[in-house]
Every structure is written in structure tokens, then in C-alpha cells.
A protein has these predicted regions:
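Solvent-exposed, non-transmembrane alpha-helical starts
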Residues: 240, 244-246
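Single conserved hydrophobic/aromatic residue that forms the stacking wall/gate
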Residues: 247-257
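Proline-centered helix-kink/hinge sites
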Residues: 29-32, 124, 228, 250-252
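Active-site catalytic microenvironments for nucleophilic, acid-base chemistry
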Residues: 106-110, 199, 251
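Histidine/acidic-residue-rich, glycine-tolerant segments that coordinate divalent metal ions
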Residues: 62-65, 82-90, 94-95, 101, ...
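Acidic/His- and Gly-rich active-site-bordering loop/insert found
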Residues: 3-115
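Short loop segments at secondary-structure junctions
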Residues: 69-72, 175, 241
Length: 257
């Protein structure tokens, strides 16, 4: 039997269990750096096949790792499992985690024959928390020849387009006042925030086609009859590479500045 067929046979034997893992994660979402139940659940699932799991790891309470094999180039399979506020696993981290764990478990008895090592690396807080960056700084990717994971989407794509992303928080500070009794004494921080969104909309017409810019108002005030003295928004700026993001004219960052 070929290695590929052996892998498929291993995967088929755990297919039902993997679906159960994905469904459990979907029904039990946890935010970044707070994935206590999820990380424990995943670690226990992996331990049912191999008990050599390091948990926690990388100075992160909800990170874990396990390496199959002792010799050969190291392949890291990323396991993401944090969810989004309000909308849970809308980004499909339950699928990402299940796919990587399934691949790692199915390969555990084949690594020597393949001549590789395979590491399952649980990476918390990928929705803005930078869990992989922290683990990278702690040496979790040291000696890795490559790092892989899948991401759910409407199409199967083996070589997708990747983008650079920068995240910004934009704050405006004004002066509060009663909007009906003494509006002339206020300095409306929400007006400034709205103007920023107008600027961003006009900039989109001239931006390089591959650039993307999207934001939301996180704090816009608390009562209609109070002129807001403080507002904040969060933005994601994306492009095909760093130079295109920062140095094209106009760039997404120009709209914010």
C-alpha cells in the first residue's frame, strides 16, 4: 500500500471523531487568549492518540504542541481555535483546527517512513491577538522547514493569494457638552470620526485595485444628547505586499493620516 493510501486509511478511521471535534468547537466559541475549554478539549483529543503533548507552551496558557517523529525536516501544522466576538466561529477556526489535528494524527505513524517530523502547534488569539508572533518569538517555529494550514472558503485553492495586513486604532479627543442645552461648548469627536470614514471612501476610488481598507467605529459616544468627547475606530489595511501597502500613492494609510 502506498503512503498516500495509508494516510487516507488513517484519516477515514478518525473522520467521524474529527467532525465531532469541529461541531463541539463551533458550539463552544471562545475569544483570543481565553480559549481555556477549547485548548483543553483539543489536547485531550490528541492525547487519546498520543500522550506526548506539551501544554501549555510558549508562555501562553492556551497554546500547545506535539511533535511526531524524531528525524528529518520539520513541518509545522497550525491549529487555530479562537473565535470572533458576537459571531463565534464565522472565520472557520473550528475547521482549521480540525483539519490540522486530523492531518497530524493521520501522519503520526507514517513520519518515519516519510523521513519527516510533524509538529501540531496550537496557536491562540489569531483574530488580532498575534498568537503565532508570540510563539515565533518563543522559538516554536525554530528548525521548521515549512508551516502549513488550511482555511475554509467557497472554493478549493491550493495556491491562494496572500496579503499584507496592518491594523490601526484611530482615536479622536474632543470636549463633551449637552447637545441641546449648550452645543457651542462642545467639540464633537464623532464628527471627526465620520469625516475619516468619508475620506476613506473617497480614497478608495484612487487606490491600487489590490489594496483593501475597512474599518468600524468601536466607540461613538454613549447618549444622543451628549456631544462625544472621545471616539475610536479600528481599521484593517491590506495589500499584496508591504511596499504596495505603504508606498503606493495614494495608500490606504494616507486616508487615515
Amino acid at each position: 500500500m502506498t503512503i498516500k493510501n495509508k494516510f487516507k486509511e488513517e484519516l477515514e478511521s478518525i473522520h467521524k471523531s474529527l467532525i465531532e471535534v469541529s461541531d463541539w468547537m463551533y458550539e463552544n466559541p471562545e475569544l483570543g487568549f481565553e480559549e481555556y475549554k477549547t485548548s483543553e478539549y483539543l489536547v485531550n483529543f490528541i492525547k487519546s492518540f498520543h500522550d506526548n503533548v506539551i501544554f501549555p507552551t510558549g508562555d501562553l496558557e492556551t497554546a500547545f504542541e506535539i511533535t511526531f517523529g524524531k528525524e528529518g525536516p520539520l513541518v509545522v501544522l497550525g491549529v487555530e481555535y479562537d473565535a470572533l466576538p458576537e459571531i463565534g466561529h464565522a472565520c472557520g477556526h473550528n475547521v482549521i483546527a480540525t483539519a490540522s489535528i486530523g492531518a497530524g494524527i493521520a501522519l503520526r505513524n507514517l513520519v518515519d517512513e516519510l523521513g519527516v517530523r510533524v509538529k501540531l502547534l496550537g496557536t491562540p488569539a489569531e483574530e488580532g491577538g498575534g498568537g503565532k508572533i508570540i510563539l515565533l518569538d518563543k522559538g516554536a517555529f525554530e528548525d521548521a522547514k515549512c508551516s502549513m494550514m488550511i482555511h475554509p472558503g467557497p472554493l478549493n485553492v491550493a495556491n491562494p493569494t496572500f496579503t499584507t495586513i496592518q491594523q490601526y486604532k484611530v482615536e479622536f479627543f474632543g470636549k463633551d457638552a449637552h447637545a441641546a442645552g449648550a452645543p457651542e461648548k462642545g467639540r464633537n469627536a464623532l464628527d471627526a470620526q465620520i469625516q475619516l470614514f468619508v475620506n476613506a471612501s473617497t480614497y478608495r476610488q484612487q487606490m491600487v485595485q489590490s489594496n483593501r481598507m475597512h474599518g468600524v467605529i468601536k466607540d461613538g459616544g454613549f447618549k444622543p444628547n451628549i456631544i462625544p468627547s472621545y471616539t475610536s475606530s479600528e481599521w484593517y489595511l491590506r495589500s499584496l505586499n508591504k511596499d504596495c501597502l505603504l508606498y503606493t500613492s495614494p495608500s490606504p494609510r494616507d486616508a487615515l493620516e
